């Protein structure tokens, strides 16, 4: 027989050196955690007071009745409302990197085409409306490539953000406006189970809600009863006065719901 021997460098038997080691996080970007950014609500007074006469968001072809959405906040921490880690059965919750086309959707199925430009907005939030299928930043803008690469979308909240340059956005979007529903369509439907982690909720909130929903039978009737109470017994103020204090802190909410009359504002 013939014996064949192969000589290999010792290093190749020991595996790659430290400088050659590939770690998963080096090639796979982790999901965006919206909690790392200030809540969109934190800029409300700045927009409403300091930039009152400025055009912050311009939209062409905005569908009739559509509301431009800057963010969806579902968690309260005693200081402000913000984004949390919302889990749901179909996995649509949370921001996911999307490129330009939202998974499961296409421009061909979208009912509306529009263009949006923003100026002086704070944070990574990209204004949207409806159920977006495609969102493309204007290629001629200096930061468009990074904005597009950093585009993330939350299918559960129907909101967008970008990890690219912020402050000024120019983009087109294809979207579909959901139809309006009648209350009767939800008569036998229970509200989705809340999986968030609210903390430091003002102690009187639960008692106030219970007090005004005693005769309500369904979850929708409870929501409508609270809505009716706020509309009928509450007052709206857009003045920066003692009755319309800034913020949504625990103390601010406690004072609001215990006061006579109850006075609130858009914030």
Regions found by a protein language model. Give the residues of each.
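Helix-boundary/low-complexity linker signature
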Residues: 1-267
């Amino acid at each position: 027989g013939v014996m064949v021997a192969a000589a290999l460098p010792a290093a190749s038997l020991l595996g790659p050196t430290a400088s050659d080691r590939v770690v998963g996080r080096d090639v796979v970007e982790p999901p965006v955690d919206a909690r790392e950014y200030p809540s969109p609500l934190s800029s409300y007074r700045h927009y409403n007071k300091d930039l009152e006469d400025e055009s912050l968001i311009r939209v062409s072809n905005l569908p009739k009745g559509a509301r431009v959405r800057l963010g969806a906040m579902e968690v309260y921490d005693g200081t402000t409302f913000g984004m949390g880690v919302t889990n749901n059965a179909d996995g649509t919750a949370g921001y996911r990197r999307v490129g330009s086309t939202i998974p499961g959707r296409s421009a061909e199925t979208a009912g509306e085409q529009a263009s949006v430009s923003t100026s002086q907005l704070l944070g990574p939030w990209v204004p949207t409306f409806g159920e977006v299928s495609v969102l493309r930043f204007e290629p001629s803008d200096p930061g468009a490539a990074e904005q597009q690469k950093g585009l993330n979308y939350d299918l559960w909240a129907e909101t967008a953000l970008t990890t690219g340059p912020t402050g000024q956005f120019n983009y087109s979007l294809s979207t579909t406006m959901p139809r309006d529903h009648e209350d009767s369509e939800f008569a036998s439907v229970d509200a989705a189970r809340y999986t968030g982690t609210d903390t430091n909720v003002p102690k009187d909130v639960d008692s106030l809600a219970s007090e005004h929903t005693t005769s309500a039978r369904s979850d929708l009737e409870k929501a409508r009863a609270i809505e009716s109470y706020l509309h009928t017994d509450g007052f709206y103020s857009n003045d920066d006065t003692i009755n319309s204090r800034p913020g949504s802190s625990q103390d601010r909410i406690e004072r609001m719901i215990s006061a006579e009359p109850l006075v609130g504002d858009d914030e």
